[in-house]
């Protein structure tokens, strides 16, 4: 069972929670899912931003989030039928990287065309094909924050929007549940989908 939630924070909530960067938001989301017997992270989230008055964060999880001290949260179960469609519109914020075969180091993917090609090439491993003409790449940039006084983290970011066709249901479900790409604990990898009826 998967649960979809929306956390809404107003300006006063963000100030009280001291959300100043991506790590501040990471800390708030993690507080909604206390550790249970050392089990690994079982949730994903995506910061949808908002207007001057309200910020919205989408959350996908295997358990219900705690009631937050600040803000409002709305949760509902995702019906199994929702994940049995063949075609979806999608949006996903990804930390796009590639691993060097020799050094095993990861390097960021740069440039809109390279990002476009990278996503299409990776899609089959995630269980779907992308309609190439539908794929848009936006919000290309870098997210940086101080995790503590001595550690600064930097992640490349890009948002991909388009249409997909499921070609391997098990892989698709696994990547919907666990997210795609790296840095999923920092708001990357949540595949936001809407079914599309094909005639």
Residue ranges and their predicted role:
Residues 1-199:
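RNA-interacting cores
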